[in-house]
Amino acid sequence: DVDGIVIDLRNNGGGSLQEAKLLTGLFIDRGPTVQIRSKSNRVDILDDRDISIIYDGPLAVLVNRLSASASEIFAGAIQDYERGIIIGSQTFGKGTVQSLLPLNRGQLKLTQAKFYRISGESTQEKGIIPDIKYPSSYDPESIGESTLDGPLPWDKITATNYRRKHSINHLVAELRSLHDERVSDNAEFNYLTEAFAYRKTRNEDDTISLNEEQRLQEKSDRENFWLALENKKRVALGQEPIASLDELDEEEPTIASNDASAASPAIVPTTGESETAEPASNSEIAGSSSAIPVSKTDEAREEPEEEDTTPDPYLVESGHILLDLISLEERTAAGLKQARDT
């Protein structure tokens, strides 16, 4: 038995539509999971018809800007059903499906459908907005469907008939308050918040000086900022401050040691599409990576990577939020029982 489950969908570019439906079905008894509107405006509703539930306890879903496509469908369904709490940052906003049509030379990619949550809201462009937000590792102004040229806009269609599985929306405000209080003096969260705010400010400056002296000064200012921020975190964690960023362990790089020039790396998740013009309901809504053949000899030579045991502040805090949810639900249940008994 477990007290709660955190499903980590960060950097998850998606998968098949069928898998998104099946995964949702593990946590609900039955009901619609997603709507698909074709180019002819026909709307198909995919349902979970299996009344069995694998897990009915407290649930949290952790997402970020690189959570896309099928990940967004699952997170949106969990949020609409109030089956669990969504934590993290705004997702990618990949709410369309494309087909690849073969040509004599190359291929033609055509958008043939859009996905909609059971509430009727599209996941296109806006993505999923978490119930509790974390500082984002990625700049939403440079990564996401909304940053592409001419993306299809967000819109809304008629909601499906569905019954909420739980009632947790009334607890979200208190959960946010508990979260904010907890992370206000959390060294890791303060570090991440300041780091990403600094990167965002730098990313908004689209000018580059051609003056060598000024460029050197900017480089020095940047290094001084990261050194001060790194030492601020280290002191808060009871660690010895460092005199230079060069002292940081290369095997465990931090944001300061990477010191990227933009607010976020230019990474786009694989939110690909079906390779043939199949009906939208049967299409794959996330990318299929090209397989590179590896011989058994090559596999034998590969050494297993050492497991990273560094605590993930986002995952740790998500566990705390889930514990808060469990506590609040128990309090609510106790209050209802007392009201019935009196």
What kind of region is each of these model predictions?
Residues D1-T342:
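C-terminal "post-core" interaction segments
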